[in-house]
Amino acid sequence: MIKLDMTILDSLKENKALRKLLFSGHFGLEKENIRVTSDGKLALTPHPAIFGPKEDNPYIKTDFSESQIEMITPVTDSIDDVYNWLENLHNIVSLRSKNELLWPSSNPPILPAEKDIPIAEYKTPDSPDRKYREHLAQGYGKKIQLLSGIHYNFSFPEALIDGLYDEISLPNESKRDFKNRLYLKVAKYFMKNRWLLIYLTGASPVYLADFTKTKQEEKLRDGSSALHDGISLRNSNAGYKNKESLYVDYNSFDAYISSISNYIEAGKIESMREFYNPIRLKNAHTDQTVESLAKHGVEYLEIRSIDLNPLEPNGISKEALHFIHLFLIKGLLSEDRELCENNQQLADENENNIALNGLSKPAIKNCDNEEMALADAGLLELDKMNDFIQSLRPEDTYFQAIIEKQKERLLHPEKTIAAQVKEQSATAGFIEFHLNQAKTYMEETEALAYKLIGAEDMELSTQIIWKDAIARGIKVDVLDRAENFLRFQKGDHVEYVKQASKTSKDNYVSVLMMENKVVTKLVLAENNIRVPFGDSFSDQALALEAFSLFKDKQIVVKPKSTNYGWGISIFKNKFTTEDYQEALNIAFSYDSSVIIEEFIPGDEFRFLVINDKVEAVLKRVPANVTGDGIHTVRELVEEKNMDPLRGTDHLKPLEKIRTGPEETLMLSMQKLSWDSIPKANETIYLRENSNVSTGGDSIDYTAEMDDYFKEIAIRATQVLDAKICGVDIIVPRETIDRDKHAIIELNFNPAMHMHCFPYQGEQKKIGDKILDFLFE
């Protein structure tokens, strides 16, 4: 077995900066899932149109089949970030694949006849990507192409390579040659020891009987087949391999390039893309030819042998990602040993033996053809990992715990992923087990559909439009996280967006007018659009003196320039001087000027207008609780606020009901307190204004709303030259009174999340509508 390279280890021990860099890197993932129907059959629908042409979307493509979706993360600087990206892509694809599920196994679901398996479609029939897939279908068959998995792309930090180059490079060795040699060394280690990775991550021991046959299989009660003691059909000789073994020369980078070129010239493979090695040396240039690799050198490694783990929602655990990273670090820190053709054959035998018989703990052969017990061989490698962790990062208990878990799996095969998958498939059936997993994961995705993992600290509307941009393959940069300021880029087209709806389409003066409610009302009224009459005050004493003008009227007291319904008090019934003064105190706490205006009876609706079209209408019900005759108002609020969809600061679709001065005032107007116990089924309103932002409930009314009011909303936005605008209209309950409506506010930064995830009714794709407006 391969020893640790003490030259590198000693250099790292003496250099704290290099030690830190060793455990970092650049990470990217590619994941394939087959789209299936609710009964586990290959979905024959086209690739979802929302993702756009496959050539143009860097994140969401297809692999071989039109039904085989591929998710590609960008390169990140941490495993946490790449895992979040994978989870977000998985969620986006799941939610956009209507009435379909993502099949969680590497082994295919129920397939149609070979001729009916659709090859991925591209912009033109003669696309190189289409031609390549037709070549594969002819050479290997379509069914075998549907084996799916995860590709793990990794590179060491350039600063680490630079530091090691200064410390341990050979005389007269260029930086490029050193880097190529380093990655080649890691690849050799991987090829020799990949059996261990397959044992620990393999997850495809069960498959449908009509997919393939193996000598080691047993029949399960549902008629599916399982490898008797196997780990991974996909990584076995029955999986997806080149037609014949291709042994490349690992003695030098130039020899590696030459041997692949020779296979291409001999017609063994069409191009480097068809070199189905478990690990490939790659660079970031998109043509991915052997000539490009020779010219630019190695920039990263691509590991291709990772099965989809059906026990994980995203197909792989964060723990597995960390272990693979440690595995590659082990390759860097190991002695550079020859990987001749004979050694490659032994490595292939070990891989196939583990893939087909791993649960029976077969012996592992070393390069001298000597056998070692599986557990002993595996523990030897894991102990060396522990050694360099203890030596270079002794404080890291997380990595040590990961190694200990892998040891448990080595000593107890029943704890492997493969054993668990086989057991559960045997109990429920191959199709039923994987369908249940897929449905469970879909339910979990739907429950958090509003969320962008890793951006939970940002406004919900920002998360939504960011997710919708990813779906379209639009590049997103965060310019100012606290301000929710993003940059979207599609090709050469760049858009800057703040808080999801402040865009380049905004007119600055329009924003200023909408920000000032007095100006808004004045301009609308001058254009014969009905608004409530009233007055504004900058002096609280003068506002208080005006009590006699308003005391017998239904009125609204609100700040002049606030948003989200904050600081608003509504009096529909008789009110006292004290009530009036408290309302002024609240309003002046939000602004230096307040408006006192008539209360318009009716229901409040939010009309979302984008580019002169009403895209959504929402009825907003004021914050309320329903009594049960047992609990107090305060207790009922606490219970309603436990809804997982309720949060604060617009981070969830609904806002928690507050227990502040506005709510206390509203209760007092009903002769109630927080300790009052409402009757069963009695609705108690805690707010007069119906903003969702203050704990109200949202109900979609887009289809039901009269076009008469939609036209009024559009006209109001046209008057102020507003392109993305929330128009709040009080609509009378009786049709005969519709002329008694009034616009009470125009919002230049309307929240979209309440339309996307209403309390009741149809969810609207507002992020898509804004992106359409910006980019099309």
Swiss-Prot record:
Mg(2+) 1 binds at D728, E745. This is Glutathione biosynthesis bifunctional protein GshAB. Pathway: Sulfur metabolism; glutathione biosynthesis; glutathione from L-cysteine and L-glutamate: step 1/2; Sulfur metabolism; glutathione biosynthesis; glutathione from L-cysteine and L-glutamate: step 2/2. Mg(2+) 2 binds at E745, N747. It comes from Listeria welshimeri serovar 6b (strain ATCC 35897 / DSM 20650 / CCUG 15529 / CIP 8149 / NCTC 11857 / SLCC 5334 / V8). Monomer. NCBIfam families: glu_cys_lig_rel, PRK02471.1. The gene is gshAB. Binds 2 magnesium or manganese ions per subunit. Residues 521-775 form the ATP-grasp domain. The keyword Metal-binding applies. PROSITE patterns: ATP_GRASP. Its cofactor is Mg(2+); Mn(2+). Mn(2+) 2 binds at E745, N747.
